Each structure stands twice: as C-alpha cells, then as structure tokens.
Amino acid sequence: MNFLLCIFKGVYVIKLIQRFFKLESAGGILLLFSAVVAMLLANSPLSNQYNDFLNLPVSLQIGSFSINKTLIHWINDGFMAVFFVLVGMEVKKELFEGALSTYQQAIFPAIAAIGGMVIPAVVYWFIAKQDPSLANGWAIPMATDIAFALGIMALLSKQVPLPLKIFLLALAIIDDLGAIVVIALFFSHGLSVQALIFSAVAIIVLILLNRFKVSALCAYMVVGAILWASVLKSGVHATLAGVIIGFSIPLKGKKGERPLDDFEHILSSWSSFVILPLFAFANAGVSFAGIDVNMISSPLLLAIASGLIIGKPVGIFGFSYLSVKLGLAKLPDGINFKQIFAVAVLCGIGFTMSMFLASLAFDANAGESVNTLSRLGILLGSTVSAILGYLFLKQTTKLS
C-alpha cells in the first residue's frame, strides 16, 4: 500500500512539474528562484563553498589548443554565447518575417529602444560623473532582461493585448541588438590578429553553409564551436560569436524545412530553464556582509538604479511619444500611451543582462566593493521596475 502511495505521489509531482514548465511565466519564475538561492547562499555559512564552486578551474584542451577559465567565466563566456545564438535567431526571424520586417512595423519600437538605451546611459553618467573609475559602467542600465519582463507580463497574459506583447518583444530584440553593438565596440580588448583570421574563416564557412541552405544543425554547431573559441582567443567578446551563428542558420532549407525554427525550439527551453537561471545563480550572489546604510548613497548604486527606474521609462516613453507627435512613427493599433508607459517601466528590469554588462564593465580588478555595489544597484533597480511595471500594466490593461 505504501509502495502504491509513493508511486501515486511521484506521478502527481511529475505532473505538477510538467504543468509548471508549460506556464508562460515559468522562465521568469525560475530566474527569480535562482537569484534568490544565490543570494541566500552568498549570505549563509555556505558562502565560501558557493564562491569556491564558482571559481573552480575548468580547462579544455585539444592538442596544443587550450582554454583555462573558472566556472563562472565558462558560464559568462560560454553559456551566454549559446543564449546569444538564440538572440541572433530571434532577431533574424523578426527582421525577415516578423515584427521588424517592414519599416512601419520596425520604426516605432526602434525609436523607443534608442530612447531606452540613450537616456539610462545619460542618467548613469550624470550621477556617476564625479568618480572617473565608474565611467565604464554607463552601459549597465541600458539592458532589458526580456525573460523577466515577459515573465511579469505573462502573469497578466489574459488581459494584455497582443499588440502590446509584440511591442515589448520587438523593443527587447532591438535592445539586444544595441547591447551587441556596445559589447563589440566598447568591451573588446587586446585583439589577436591570428585568432581574428581563424574567426573570419569560420564566418565564411557559416556564410557558405547558409548560402547553400544546409539544414544539418550539427554542421553549424561544429563550425560555431570553432568560431566561439577563435573569437574568445581574439579579444572580442565571445558572445558575439553566438549572434553570428544565430544569423547564419537559414530560415528555410532546400526541401522547405525550417532549420532556424527547429534550432530555436531546441534552444529556447535550454535558454529559459538552464542557461539564464544558471547565469543568475552565478552572478546574483551578492553578499550583504559589511554593507551599511551609507552604501545606499553610493554614486554607483544610485546611478545604476536610477538609470533602470527613471532612465528606462523616461527614454522609452519619451522617445515613443515624440516619434508619434512628430509624425515619425504611428502608435500600433489596439494599445495606448498609458500601456506604453507601463511597458517602459517594465523594461527597467535589467537583471541578468545588466549583470552581464556589469561583469564586462567592472572585472575582478575593479574591487569587491565596486562589483557588490553594481549588483546591488541592478537588483534594486530591477526589483522596483518589476513591481511598478506589474502594477502599472495591471491598471492600464484593466482600464482598456
């Protein structure tokens, strides 16, 4: 009898887990859970074990070629490159077939995204300008964590109009493109010509695979792995390899099959339920030891939090409103400016993407206090943006 009861409970638990992973908000919930676990571990008696685990040396060697990095660097440089493969595929799909495929569709979220990148950077600079050592952090509040933002929106999915979801997705995709440009231009150092030549050869091979509409995903994975390793060694940030790989996968194969859709379907689950939660677990572990009230007034913390809480909504909403009033763009049918403002506030959730940019802006040499304050600023700004965004979205969609 007890054996049957155990089986029944096991089946019930499995069904609950399956139901959870089918939820639209599952990815966002898992991200939040991973971040909370990381913070609990970082502030518990297990904090040393947590940090030791993240700093485990992991090596990959093939002949004379080797990559030696700590586990956290493998997560940030390796796993996040896989995430950017997905970003590259999503951007390509939207540019050729989706919400960004025509000028009329693309211009409104494009202008909004520009505002959402420029104004947070300006807010950051204005607050942090008195300390030159903080200058590199201007890009941190530019980012939007699309997984979290869509997760919050999914909590109200039944009352959120479809055009508003499309606007948020298009906005986030253009935001990601902006982040890619920023990484390429400002966070690539000490370039190796030899590694860049290997990277160029790998890119040419990917272009040829795309040109001949090769549908075998394993071919892109093998060449993509070579490209990633070459880009990593070149001094250019390795996540850019992910974007190039994503763009190289064809929308349609020779026989009408859709390789990009197939690969996107495979990667989306891995990204939502493994890669991003793992990134959050590795980067959200902020220790509150030694933090006092005076730190709240730190220029770095205030600059990042203000960039996300104030800069994002002001930039996105302000540029959106002006673009319509000046006749540069048209407000999408079915949504209003109050809902645009709610989405603009929601885009202040920088979380994993902001932490990723912070890891590039401030390396280990910047000091523990700088890294801690930057993560605290991101957590504060993202939390406030999530709460306010949810409340504004609930109110504006209910009124509509």
Curated annotation (Swiss-Prot):
What the entry lists under Pfam families is as follows: Na_H_antiport_1
Q: Name one GO molecular function term.
A: sodium:proton antiporter activity
Q: Which residues cross the membrane?
A: 26-46, 71-91, 107-127, 137-157, 166-186, 189-209, 212-232, 233-253, 273-293, 299-319, 340-360, 373-393
For this UniProt record, give its keywords in alphabetical order, as a comma-separated list.
Antiport, Cell inner membrane, Cell membrane, Ion transport, Membrane, Sodium, Sodium transport, Transmembrane, Transmembrane helix, Transport
Membrane-related topology note: Multi-pass membrane protein
Q: Which GO terms describe its cellular component?
A: plasma membrane
Intracellular or extracellular location(s): Cell inner membrane
Q: Name one GO biological process term.
A: regulation of pH
Reactions catalysed, as given in the entry? Na(+)(in) + 2 H(+)(out) = Na(+)(out) + 2 H(+)(in)
Q: InterPro entries per the record?
A: Na/H_antiporter_dom_sf, NhaA
Primary localization class, coarse: membrane
Role summary: Na(+)/H(+) antiporter that extrudes sodium in exchange for external protons.
Question: Which HAMAP family does the protein's record reference?
Answer: NhaA
Belongs to which family?
A: Belongs to the NhaA Na(+)/H(+) (TC 2.A.33) antiporter family.
Protein name as it appears in the record: Na(+)/H(+) antiporter NhaA
Q: Which gene encodes it?
A: nhaA
